[in-house]
Amino acid sequence: MTPKIRAPFLARRTYIKSLGALGLLGVTGVPVRGESFAQSVAPATLDPILPYDPRYTALIRGFNQRFEGDPSYIQLCASPQQVLQAVQSAVDAHLRITIRGGGHCYEDFVTNNDQGVLIDLSPLNAVYQENGLYCLEGGCTLWNVYTRLYKEYGVTIPAGSCYSVGVGGHIAGGGYGLLSRKYGLTVDYLAAVELVHVTKDGKAQLVTIRPNALNPAECDLFWAHQGGGGGNFGVVTKYWFKNLPIAPPVAYLTNIAWNWPELHQEQFSQLITNYGNFFAGHSAVDSPYKDLFTLLRVTHKAGQQIILTIQYVGDHPELIDQFVQAIAPQGIRYVSQPTSQDPHRLPQTPGTRKLSWLEATQILNGSGPNQRGKYKSAYMLRPFTAEQINVMWKFLTMSSYANPQALVLVDSYGCQVNAVSSTATAIPQRSAIMKLQYLTQWVMPEEDRIHLQWIRDFYTAMYGPPGPYPD
């Protein structure tokens, strides 16, 4: 079973758990100054989207098509002042509030708000620089952020690959992506957060919080936004960042695959073992492989191929071949032009491609079509055990469950991510070497039970009934 991550006891973690949604008692912050162009031209209010509005049925669903809500209304907000008004109106009416940025939430935490208020931040999406800091408004999506930061300032954030993910929840959860081994997590660059919260007497307030505030509660709240999750502490209207890294000038992309029909269990075990062992030995801050990021898509055999995607953004692209040689199992060839129909794969071009970083980021977009799905995650502190690899083989070769969209995605982790103390932010997994995502996707509602049972049985077999230790 996977070693469980047990973070040291932190009073701040208790603080996070003690806060209700939007109820941030004792936090005053500092006055909000200035406004973006989008705010200056936004109307005082936007009309709510009610159930009879033709847009309503489209907006009560997000990325995961399993979930459909029934809110009393959907309130679009194009400025922090509109968010402030929307929150106050909901509080006055005693309506539950949920928040949506990109709508990419995997579980039913957003649209599941029957007769409540869904605050949609998508119109609040400006990206700009002011007083030496970079501002991302709460409704931005990642592709919007990448293109604006790259084209206008030449910098980036080390966030995720899915273009449609909203920054509001993604950054509050840590902000991990393909540049994290090189640059760390997005929250490591966070300088301030502007948000709307509610006082104990029911008054909505728009405040800006910083890590060096005199008020300890404000410092704790800022810390919580560095990985404590989104939607729990208020409605984030702006993130401010300092010293963002320069975007890499080029990126080298390689895509290789192993054909399932040619793969025996011994070779499968060797591949998974070698992959884990490599990152156990190359996840230190000073690793020569810190510019290397990999995504191993260990698909169900119905998907025909196990696909490895490699991005390298350093000065020694020959390290790509060295990595492949280190992890490739013996006795089976890999193909350098995968033929899988996986919607997330790279275009079918053999060998390594040298691209601009922005073009590579666009190619590696992992959003795919909106479907029904179930997702689970875990972090690995050390390589897979033989027992775990046997469990993976069992569930990924199961003939009674043949879904080509079922897989385990094993991302490389560590290096600059782990340069930061596990107590400095609300991210405790600063010693992990791999990040796992178990997922299965499908289309038909009547198949829900089959797919949910498979992934739950798989996850339980990997970690035991309690699962990995959450904190």
Give the location of each predicted region.
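Soluble FAD-dependent oxygen oxidases
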Residues: T2-R12, I16-D471
